[in-house]
Amino acid sequence: MKLQRFTLLIAAVLLFTCAVVAQELEPSAAKLQQHVTYLASDELDGRRTGTAGANEAAKYIAKEFERLGLRPAPATDSRKINVMSARYLQTFPYIGSVELGKNNVLSVQSGETLNFRAGEDWMPLGISTNKKLDLTEVVFAGYGITANELNHNDYKGTYTKNQVAVIQKGTPDGDNPHGRFTTAGQLRFKVAAAQSAGVGALLIISSEDDLKNDALARLSYDNAGLAGIPVAVISKQTAEKLANAKQITLATDVVRADVPAHNVIGVIEGSDPVLKNEYIVIGAHYDHLGRGGEGSLAPRSGEIHHGADDNASGTAGVLELARIFNTQRQKLKRTLVFIAFGGEEEGLLGSNYYVNHPLVPLDKTVAMINMDMIGRMKDRKLVIGGVGTAQEWRQLITQANMSLKTTIAANSGSAAPKGVPIVVSANGRPIMTVDPNGAFELTMNEDGYGPSDHSSFYSKQIPVLFFWTGTHSDYHKPSDTFDKINYNDEARILSLVARIVRDVDSADPRLTFTTAKSAPPRGGGFRVYLGTIPNYADSNDGLLIDGVRDDSPAAKAGLKAGDKIVKIGNREVKNVYDYTAALGDMKAGQEYVIEVLRGGEKLTLKIVPQARN
C-alpha cells in the first residue's frame, strides 16, 4: 500500500511538472485568429509569391517579429539580407514579371502574306524560349499528348525542326478533372511531348472565341524553366489560316524579370554560452495561390484563394510560438530561428534557397519543425511526419502528447477526482488534474521527405518534424477561409509543438540524425517510381536532385543528392517537366541509361524503375 502511494506521488510530481510547463507554453486561440484573419483577408489577394499581397504578408510577419523583440538573422558579407520594410527579410530570385517584347512575329505565306498581331491573334507563352524560326510545314497533332502508359501518341512518324506542331487545347477527356489524360494533358507535358517529337515550335489553338478571354494567353511564368522551343497560343481564326501555309515565320520575344520574393527570419538567442551556437528552426510557408491558376483546384474562377488553412494557419503558429518563447528566452539553451517561407506553392523555392544560402550554420542546426495546414483538426487526429529522422523523435513526441492530459486548476473548488494522480493544495483542493481526453490521436510517419518545406532541410541531413491536420474539400480553393479554422485545437497543437521544442532545446547531447524509412511509392499518375527528390527551382540545363530515397531504384543506380540529371534514355532533361515526361516513357523492370552531372563531370548510370503500388 505504501509503495502504491509512493508511486502515485512520483507520478503526480512528474505530471505536475509537465502541467507547469504547459501553463508556461499556453498559446492563445484569439491571437491565432487575429493573424489568420489578416493573412487570409481579401486585402492580401491570395499571397501569390512575387505579388504585392505576398509582400504585404512578409511585412506583417517582419513587423510582428520586430514587435516581439526577435532579432534579425545574422547576414554574411556575401549574402546580405535585402531590406523591404524591415531587417528580417531574406530575398530569393523569383521571376514574377512577364511582358511582351518588341520582336514578336507570326506571319505565313499562302499565296499572300498574312501578318498576325501578338496579343490579339496569338500570344507567346511565358515559358516560351525566345527564338526566330523560318518554318516550312504545319503539322496538326491532335491534343499533342504522348502517354505511353495509356498507349496514346499524337505524334506518329518523324518530325523535324522545320515543322511547327499545331494542337488542340485540353484532352480527349474534356473537362473531367479525374480523366485518364489529366496529367499528360497538362501544358508542360504537352510541351515536353512536342520537344521530344522533334518539332521546332508548338502552337496551341485557343478554346475561347476571343483570345483575350483565354487564361492561357495571360502572360505568366511558373519558375520551372523555359520550354526549350517557342510556344504560343493562337486564336481559332488564326489556326484556320495556317492550314494551307507554305512558309511560317515565327519569332517569340518574352521579357521575364525578377521581382522581390522573401523568406522572413527572426531569432531568439539561447542563454547557454555554448549551446546558443546550436539552432532549432521553426517554420511554415506564408505564400498561397493568389487568384488561382497553377496549383488551383478552381483554376478558372479568378477568385481570391484565401489560403486560411494553407498556410495562414501554420504562419500564425510560427508567430504565436515566437511570442511564447520570447517570454521565456532566459530558459532557452539553444537559439530558436523562426522562418516564414515564401515560394512553397511554386516548389519549395524559399526553403530550398535558405538551405543553400543559410543564415545560421546547417551543421549546427539540430532540428527543423514545420507546420503546414494545422487549422482543420477533426476528432483530435493529428499527423506528424519525419518521425524517423532522429532516434529520439518518437519518445519525445509520445511524452509531449501524454503531457497534454495534465491540467492546472489552481482556483478550482471542485473535489479531487477519484482514481487519478492529483496534487492538492493546503486546503485539500486539487491544483492539478488529469484530462484523459487531452492527448491527440497521432499518426506518426517515418519519412523526412514530403511536399512541404521540411523536405529541404531533411535533404541536408537535419532531423525534421512535419505537423499537419489533413486535407479537406476547401484545399486550394477560394473557400479556404478564416472562419473555418478550428482555433482552439490549433492552439492545442501548438502546445504540443512547444513541448517538443522545449525538450529538443534542453536535450544533451543533440538529436541523432537518422535516414528515415521512405514511404512506399503510390499513385502519381505514372506506373514507375525512381525514388529521387527533385529540386523544383528554375532550371534550363538539367534537373537537380535534392535527395534520393533509401533502397530506391535511384539509390541502387548510384544517384546522389546534388546530381543533375541531363538525360534519361533518349529524352533530354532540362527541367522537372522533362523529367516527369521521361517517367511516362519508362516501364517497370526495364533498364535505362541515365546521364548526370556530378561536380562538373558527366556520369552514365543504369537505372531500373520500380512499379508503383
Locate predicted features.
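Noncatalytic luminal/extracellular "stalk/propeptide" segments of secretory-pathway proteins
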Residues: 34, 45-172, 176, 254, ...
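His/Asp/Glu-rich mid-to-C-terminal helical/loop segments that flank catalytic regions of hydrolases
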Residues: 231, 323, 327, 473-519
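Metal-dependent peptidase/peptidase-like ectodomains
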Residues: 115-117, 231, 239-240, 341-470, ...
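Acidic/histidine-rich catalytic neighborhood of metal-dependent amide-processing enzymes
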Residues: 185, 189, 260-263, 290, ...
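C-terminal recognition in membrane/secretory proteostasis and scaffolding
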Residues: 442, 477-479, 496, 505-613
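Bacterial N-terminal signal peptides
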Residues: 7-19
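N-terminal capping segment at the start of a domain
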Residues: 27-52, 68-74, 86-89, 213-223, ...
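Soluble metallo-hydrolase cores and metallopeptidase-like ectodomains found primarily
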Residues: 24, 97-101, 117, 121-157, ...
